[in-house]
Curated annotation (Swiss-Prot):
DNA-binding positions: 99-289
GO molecular function annotation: ATP-dependent DNA/DNA annealing activity; chromatin binding; copper ion binding; core promoter sequence-specific DNA binding; disordered domain specific binding; DNA binding; DNA-binding transcription activator activity, RNA polymerase II-specific; DNA-binding transcription factor activity
Protein's gene: Tp53
Oligomeric form and interacting partners: Forms homodimers and homotetramers. Binds DNA as a homotetramer. Interacts with AXIN1. Probably part of a complex consisting of TP53, HIPK2 and AXIN1. Interacts with histone acetyltransferases EP300 and methyltransferases HRMT1L2 and CARM1, and recruits them to promoters. Interacts (via C-terminus) with TAF1; when TAF1 is part of the TFIID complex. Interacts with ING4; this interaction may be indirect. Found in a complex with CABLES1 and TP73. Interacts with HIPK1, HIPK2, and TP53INP1. Interacts with WWOX. Interacts with USP7 and SYVN1. Interacts with HSP90AB1.
Positions of region (Required for interaction with FBXO42): 110-233
Alphabetized UniProt keyword annotations: Acetylation, Activator, Apoptosis, Biological rhythms, Cell cycle, Cytoplasm, Cytoskeleton, Disease variant, DNA-binding, Endoplasmic reticulum, Isopeptide bond, Metal-binding, Methylation, Mitochondrion, Necrosis, Nucleus, Phosphoprotein, Repressor, Transcription, Transcription regulation, Tumor suppressor, Ubl conjugation, Zinc
Region called Oligomerization, residue ranges: 322-353
Region ranges (Interaction with WWOX): 63-107
Binding-site list for Zn(2+): 173, 176, 235, 239
Name of the protein: Cellular tumor antigen p53
Region: Interaction with CCAR2, residue numbers: 4-317
Record region (Interaction with E4F1): 256-294
Length: 390
């Protein structure tokens, strides 16, 4: 019992001491309220960046707009980042490929070159087609009849030639996109690049996602009548995942500083390993088609079917043989069969000669043949009847 009494006495002594200590500490506190405001509590509990991440853009705009009520200066919201492009975007706008010289007589020209195997770039005038090797320089001449206004630009863009592929954007294949063959200025997915120019701009349209390269227009140098721009094509026409053997067109446009069209011209392009060979082959096929199927006059219908066919030329008929042969046949049935076959062949020859205008001579020939066949028939019958009668 003495131990319990001692413990109770200790508690009774400690309680007043603890109360006095707490009251003394409470008096030492400042009179102002140290509790933070509701806005400060929100900042302590959740940072603004994390709050925007969880609440979304609408909530983030609402939270950021709260302190703006106290500030008389209104803050404009920042620009919204565009959505990333799909790997193979489709364009809703197809550029025109029709030639338009405009007020400045804008048109293209190319250097004359042959079809040797060693040539790296060659142009075919009848096909209006450029044959070149991968990543080889192709000079293109810009001709004008009058000087364009200051600040004019030249744009080059590639599109697919066939109507079923026109809406698709022309770009390099995945293999060549990963190749480190650029100078860092051109994006890896761009097909056309410019060589020998200090101010090329590689652009991608935000709406159509089409690639183009733009350079400032420079007037011809002294003693020259045209301006030359050197282009390169960074993917083969046969690459899978890229052009995939689909023909393409390169559209060259002359624009002013505001982007208004001043002139347009285009040409077909084939990027291959042997440009001279491919040009020679395609020109030969083009000439054969012109001989077999000539072009329709301008006033005729566009969808009219060609009258010519690609059938082989008719074979020349051999002249009839004028010699006669005698054939001895044993048995009447066999003789009648050969006789009918011979008459059918003679009748066929008679029709053939009538078409060539020699029907009279052949009709007399047919009569003589029939007379000889009947006389031979009588002779053979006499020979057969002779032994039987004996």
């Amino acid at each position: 019992m003495t131990a319990m009494e001692e413990s109770q006495s200790d508690i009774s002594l400690e309680l007043p001491l603890s109360q006095e200590t707490f009251s003394g500490l409470w008096k030492l506190l400042p009179p102002e309220d140290i509790l933070p405001s509701p806005h400060c509590m929100d900042d302590l509990l959740l940072p603004q960046d994390v709050e925007e991440f969880f609440e979304g853009p609408s909530e983030a705009l609402r939270v950021s707009g709260a302190p703006a009520a106290q500030d008389p200066v209104t803050e404009t919201p920042g620009p919204v980042a565009p959505a990333p492009a799909t790997p193979w975007p489709l364009s809703s706008f197809v550029p025109s490929q029709k030639t338009y010289q405009g007020n400045y007589g804008f048109h293209l020209g190319f250097l004359q070159s042959g079809t040797a195997k060693s040539v790296m770039c060659t142009y075919s005038p009848p096909l209006n087609k450029l044959f070149c090797q991968l990543a080889k320089t192709c000079p293109v001449q810009l001709w004008v009849s009058a000087t364009p206004p200051a600040g004019s630009r030249v744009r080059a863009m590639a599109i697919y030639k066939k109507s079923q592929h026109m809406t698709e954007v022309v770009r390099r294949c995945p293999h060549h996109e990963r190749c480190s063959d650029g100078d860092g200025l051109a994006p890896p997915q761009h097909l056309i690049r410019v060589e020998g120019n200090l101010y090329p701009e590689y652009l991608e349209d935000r709406q159509t996602f089409r690639h183009s390269v733009v350079v400032p227009y420079e007037p011809p140098e002294a003693g020259s009548e045209y301006t030359t721009i050197h282009y390169k094509y960074m993917c083969n026409s046969s690459c899978m995942g890229g052009m995939n053997r689909r023909p393409i067109l390169t559209i060259i446009t002359l624009e002013d500083s505001s982007g208004n069209l001043l002139g347009r011209d285009s040409f077909e392009v084939r990027v291959c390993a042997c440009p001279g060979r491919d040009r020679r082959t395609e020109e030969e096929n083009f000439r054969k088609k012109e001989v077999l199927c000539p072009e329709l006059p301008p006033g005729s219908a566009k969808r009219a079917l060609p009258t010519c066919t690609s059938a082989s030329p008719p074979q020349k008929k051999k002249p009839l043989d004028g010699e006669y042969f005698t054939l001895k046949i044993r048995g009447r049935k066999r003789f009648e069969m050969f006789r009918e076959l011979n008459e059918a062949l003679e009748l066929k020859d008679a029709h053939a000669t009538e078409e060539s205008g020699d029907s009279r001579a052949h009709s007399s020939y047919l009569k003589t043949k029939k007379g000889q066949s009947t006389s031979r028939h009588k002779k053979t019958m006499v020979k057969k009847v002779g032994p039987d009668s004996d």
